[in-house]
Amino acid sequence: MTLKSNLTTRIKRREILRKGMAGLGVAGLGGAILKPSALSRVAEAAAMAEANGKILVILELSGGNDGLNTVVPYADDAYYQHRPEIGLPKNQLRILDDHFGLNPGMAGFERLFKDGKMAILHGCGYENPSYSHFTSMAYWHTAAPNSGQEYGWVGRLADDLDPSGTSNFLVNIAARQSLAVRSKQHVPVVFDQPSRFMREAFFDEKEALSRVPDIGNVDNPSRRFLLDIARSANDASELVRDAWGNYNSPVDYGVNSLDLPKVVSLIDSGMPTKLYYVSYRNNAFDTHVFQNNVHRRLLTYTSDAVSAFIRDLERIGRADDVALMIFSEFGRRVPENVTLGTDHGAANVMFVVGNGVKGGHYGEVPNLTKLAKGDNLAYTTDFRRVYQTLISGWLGHGGGSKILNGDFETFDMFV
């Protein structure tokens, strides 16, 4: 969207939020000293967060992770019949029980599962699945398939948890803001590199903020809103840089940390954030061709980073306060394709990890001999059941039905 000359009278709160200004990462405002008013706002927000110390972190595996080669049903002959070339033999797996084994690259996940800190949720999906990355991800981001919902489920959750829109309540570590965190009331903190506090939309946003002094009267609602955004970005940039500058951990996250050390640094700094969102970039899990090696490598990155994240939280004494949910926009088709990969599918596995999790298997395991349309796994668990479980079971919030626009049965997943 281009800011036109009539910005003075035409800017509306909703338009700015749509633009992405709701997730500001403003390097141009960096380096400023926090004024007493800013410090008081931060202190007030921190006190609110302390009242209920539970934090939810969400990790998105973009591209469509192959759940069948992640949590492998090695005891089911149908798995190998569908995948004669890319099926993973039992003697290579990290055996969990008498039916499932993890991909050989997932040593960290094996430890978490056997320590009772990881829940595996089977058959997660929704009716009439889309095989489009964009469309299916939008459904998962909004928790509203085929609805055109404007705001993300994490953003709506933030609004319901804290209708006042407390600063720094919601953090999205990424190059650009996810639909999942789009909110009516909250200004998500969106950044990629803490030292620069910059992301892809920075230059557009900097231009908009440069116009703030020209928006007329201080009582003008548009001016006040832009100034609130600028103030929020200024406060957040200082907090993020200080937190990252003070972070010094001996924990090894492996090759790709998936931005999880940044989350730990913010938690350890006392940032009042309740909801964090991180993700893989560039549809990394879209494994159409010669899948096995690249898929194992990606799962190793994920497993190493997530297990390190839990250890790092234990180091700072916050492991009991944090749950991590892991999802992908769809699974892969059950049969392998002719290029030794897999194509876009439907139902998939999800994971919830943390010290407060009752580890084990949840949901009905899909039947590999009774496939859905297109040789896909038939979903057995509506993914919103998992969201509802996190909202009510982990965060202790009773507004899940309103947020998700429906009643979804929860799992008894938390200690």
Language model features with spans:
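Acidic/histidine-rich, metal-coordinating catalytic segments
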Residues: 323-330
